[in-house]
């Protein structure tokens, strides 16, 4: 499920920067220099137009009915999550918001603006005052490629995202807590397509998003750590635009391995990207584990519902698969399975209490290698969870 767009945004940002640096000629950069990397009103217009007939707003009645259901569902869900994880939430979840696809676009443009504003500042600082290809890249390169790319992708996601727990990553003035959002037209369409009763499917989605809320609200250090990883990734990508062409040639020649996005990164960038991927895998895997355990108690026919939903993900069309490959979102889908295998393996080996060590702080988070081989993480914890830099990769 494509849910938390702070995490989705990282993949799209990386793909966008790579495409920019690898495909635009120096002369064109110089000739078309302007003032901003992205024209956000243009991006918004492209995304909204991509929705076409699916842009219909929610009526006041539809919104009120859905909101009442989600509020009641979350009241029932919270005790089940608390029972499963063995600890209470610090406080009740904020009132959720029910939104339509157009509202989702506007909500998430703020996340992308925060990401790209950091890129813009760093590229301008690196370019200095001289009118160089680097400065031109910092100022306008994506007003042709980037506007179209981001507008297309945000419009694409606006029809796919069912719900998200928004923690305002990189926001200038983030609130003390995140908020749950449900994209009701997508939830309704998915329920109908899967032939699942709407209220049962709503509860299914609300349960997953509530587990993400627990992860962040019960462990306040997590948001700062996640934000720092994203900021580090952005800085590394923005301060080395000149090497993209060389790495592109190496990737095409087969000299580099891994996903195409990873093949276009420096070793330092790949290390940071790996830490980010590991955290995303853990968050999704833990959420899925809790959801599966609590769902059996909360939702009639949960196992069948879950299987139908998973089969839906497996039946993606060729165009959708290509889009996910190009943007790096296919990496996100792979994370669900890897993270859940890690969580299940640790619980099977040492029990749920031992798994709770993941929440002690950044030093006890598993690395990407440890996500793939849980025995390595277990061994590191039993050896004293040395420093955050030891045993990580």
Set out the residue ranges of the language-model regions.
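Auxiliary, metal-adjacent structural segments of Zn-dependent hydrolase domains
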Residues: 73-185
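Post-HExxH zinc-binding segment in Zn-dependent metallohydrolases
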Residues: 147, 151-165, 216-299
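Short pre-active-site segment immediately N-terminal to the catalytic Zn-binding motif
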Residues: 187-205
């Amino acid at each position: 499920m494509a849910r938390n767009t702070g995490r989705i945004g990282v993949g799209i940002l990386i793909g966008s920067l790579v495409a920019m640096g690898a495909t635009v000629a120096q002369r064109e950069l110089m000739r078309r220099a302007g003032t901003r990397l992205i024209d956000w009103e243009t991006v918004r217009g492209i995304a909204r137009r991509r929705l076409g007939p699916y842009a219909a707003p929610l009526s006041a009645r539809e919104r009120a009915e859905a909101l009442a259901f989600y509020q009641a569902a979350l009241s029932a869900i919270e005790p089940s999550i608390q029972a499963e994880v063995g600890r209470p939430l610090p406080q009740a979840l904020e009132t959720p918001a029910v939104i339509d696809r157009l509202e989702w676009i506007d909500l998430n443009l703020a996340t992308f603006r925060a990401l790209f504003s950091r890129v813009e500042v760093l590229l301008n600082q690196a370019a200095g005052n001289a009118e160089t290809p680097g400065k031109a890249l910092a100022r306008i390169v994506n007003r042709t490629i980037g506007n179209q790319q981001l507008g297309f992708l945000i419009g694409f996601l606006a029809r796919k995202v069912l719900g998200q727990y928004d923690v305002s990553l990189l926001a200038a003035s983030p609130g003390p807590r995140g908020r749950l959002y449900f994209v009701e037209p997508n939830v309704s369409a998915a329920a109908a397509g899967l032939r699942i009763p709407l209220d049962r499917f709503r509860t299914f989605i609300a349960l997953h998003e509530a587990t993400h809320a627990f992860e962040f609200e019960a462990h306040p250090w997590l948001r700062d750590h996640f934000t720092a990883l994203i900021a580090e990734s952005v800085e590394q990508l923005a301060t080395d635009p000149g090497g993209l062409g060389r790495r592109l040639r190496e990737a095409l020649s087969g000299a580099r391995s891994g996903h195409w996005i990873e093949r276009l990164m420096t070793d330092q960038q790949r290390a940071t990207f790996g830490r980010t991927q590991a955290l995303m895998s853990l968050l999704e895997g833990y959420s899925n584990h809790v959801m599966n355990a609590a769902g059996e108690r909360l939702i009639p026919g949960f196992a069948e519902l879950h299987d139908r939903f998973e089969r839906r993900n497996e039946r993606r069309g060729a165009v959708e698969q290509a889009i996910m490959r190009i943007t790096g979102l296919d990496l996100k889908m792979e994370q669900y399975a890897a993270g859940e295998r890690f969580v299940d393996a640790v619980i099977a080996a040492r029990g749920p209490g031992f798994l709770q060590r993941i929440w002690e702080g950044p030093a006890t988070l598993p690395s990407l290698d440890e996500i793939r081989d849980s025995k390595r993480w277990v061994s590191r914890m039993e050896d004293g969870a040395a420093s955050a830099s030891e045993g990580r990769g």
